[in-house]
C-alpha cells in the first residue's frame, strides 16, 4: 500500500491496493481520515476495485486479440467502421440504465470527451490493423507518462517527486520487455502514438467527469457513445468507401467475431470507467503496464517462449518502477534517514 501523504496522490486508490485486494482480504487498519469527512466517504471498497480491475484487464486483452484476428484472419479492412459499431452497441446497451438530465456545462465536457474518445479508438484500430499486436502494446506502454503530464497540466494534480521519477523505469522497462522480442521492423506506429496521447487525455477527462461531476459509468458511456458513433460513422463513410469489399451477410463467423468484439468493448469501457471513478487515470495505466510484463512471464511459463536479455532487463526495470511508484514515501523516509533526501526540499531529492 502506498505510504504517500494524501496531497501527493492523483486519485483515491493506487493499483498496489488493487493488487492487495485481488490477492486476498487483509485486516483493516485505522482510517486515514476522520469519519464522515469527504475523503473518508470517497474510499472505495477493495473488492469493487479488484473486480473492476480484473474485468478491465481480461476484457481489454481479449478485445485487442480479437480485433487483430478480425483484421488479419478475416481480412476486415474497415477499422473505423468497427470502432463505430463498438460505439453503437455501447449506446444500445446503456440506453435504459443511463440518467438523462445533465447540466449544460457537463454536456460540453462530455462532447469534448466524445471527440477524444472516438479519435483515440479510430487511431488505435487503424494502427492495430497495420502493426503486430506486441508492437501495439509496446507503444501503449508510454501512456502513463502522457497521463501524468496531462493530469498535472489540465487538472493541477500534484505528484510526489519519486512518483515522477518512477515513470522512467516503468515506461522504459515495459518498452524494453517487448522490444527485446521484435524480429521485424516497426511500421505504422504514427497512428498508435496518436492513440496513446489521446488515450492519456481521454483518461484525464473521464476521471474529472466521474469524480468531480459524480457521473456513473453507464451514464458517461451512454453520453459519449452517441457523439462518438456519429463521428466514427461519418469518418468511415468518407475514408473507407471502396477501401475493401464489404463483408457478405453469409459470413457468419466474421459477424460473430464483430459482435463479440462490440460486447467486449462495452464491458471494457464500463470496467474502465468504474476503475477510473474508484482510483485515478494514472493508476489505471500503471496497472496496464504491469500486464505487459505479466503476459511475457506467462508466455514463458505456459508456452516455453524464450525471452531475450533485453526483455529480462525490461521486466526488472518495470518492477522497480512499480515499487517506487507505490512506495514513494517509504523510499523517501529511508533516504532521509541516510541524509539522501530532504523532506523540506523534495525537488532536490533522489
UniProtKB/Swiss-Prot annotation:
Source organism per UniProt: Homo sapiens
Taxonomic superkingdom: Eukaryota
A Pfam match: TPT
Membrane topology label: Multi-pass membrane protein
UniProt keyword list: Membrane, Transmembrane, Transmembrane helix
Protein name (database record): Solute carrier family 35 member E4
Coiled-coil features, chain-numbered ranges: none
Skewed-composition ranges (Low complexity): 19-30
